Amino acid sequence: DEIALSAGGTEALYALIANYAPLRAGDAVIYADVDYDEMQFACDYLAQSRGAQLVRFDLPEPQTKANILAAYDKILRDTPRAKLLLLTHLSNRNGLVPPVKAIVAMAKARGVDVILDSAQAVGHIPFTVADTGADFIGFSLHKWLAAPLGTGGIYIARDRLKDINPWLGNRIHDADDIRARIPTGTVDFAARLTVPAAIAMQDALDLEANHRHLLRLRDYWVERVRDVPGLEIMLPDEPGSYGAVSAFRLPGMTGPDDAKKAAKLFLDKYRLLVVAKAGLASGPVLRVTPALFNSSAELDRLVAAVIAERGLFA
């Protein structure tokens, strides 16, 4: 009774953010540059529709745990009317895994609720709800858990259910039923019926072992390019602060057009999929996301391509 399935992580988080009940005029909603675009849009909508203040801040680089904690502490201290904080469990921009439990505790100590975006974390990082301390979590099931597209879910702590309003006045389910917080239209029930099998597969594979392997893949390519002159790796090698996802910036790469050009080059010339990601305060990056099936030989191709193209914008 604390979890309901949704049509994906985005729908789940829209349901939590847009229907967050305690926000009043004059309160503040906070999010950071590493947060997912659509969840930022949802916070914008929530603040505008309630007459609340919207506070966006940029996380400092290098994004060490100490720097991240200091940044969240400062923004919470500087925003005395803060009521809601959006926190991303694993950033889809650069792969940052912040110290979630510490930030949630910091926010709660100031009376600030946290909506945790775990879309990239479920099936990727081993964790439990208790590990986060969060009362509200939205997540995807098609990314790292490998369930079909159209699967995700929300978690709402039992004693906080009334703080998320039913979806557009939904009365298909009772107000004390978490399912009232999710749209009730026709869904792909076949996709949802596969979720138990996807979970069973991940359990059989051993999530802890998967995570260790993904970290090895990430470290493999990063270690081989970190000292390339002018190349920026967007996260430090601090244990617990990243997963498989990481990002880099070629020397001289500045605007979004540069990032798109580089991503196209890597795909067309080297058959390597890197993703141009904008949104970070420091500028666009190229995201690399190895999966369990990737080999060291494939990562060697990535390393060679990065070294060969280091002068693309220099």
Predicted features, each with a name:
Residues E2, S6-A7, Y20-Q40, Q53, ...:
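Conserved PLP-anchoring active-site segment centered on the Schiff-base-forming lysine
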Residues Q53-V55, T64-A119, G123:
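Active-site phosphate-binding strand-loop segment of PLP-dependent enzymes
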Residues T132-I172:
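Active-site PLP attachment segment
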Residues D176-F189:
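A short glycine-threonine-serine/GTX helix/turn-capping micro-motif
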Residues A190, V195-P236:
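Conserved PLP-dependent catalytic core of the aminotransferase class-I/II
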Residues L215-D219, V225-K269:
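Conserved PLP-binding catalytic core of the aspartate aminotransferase-like
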Residues G255-D258, K264-V274, A278-A314:
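PLP-dependent enzyme catalytic core of the Aspartate aminotransferase-like
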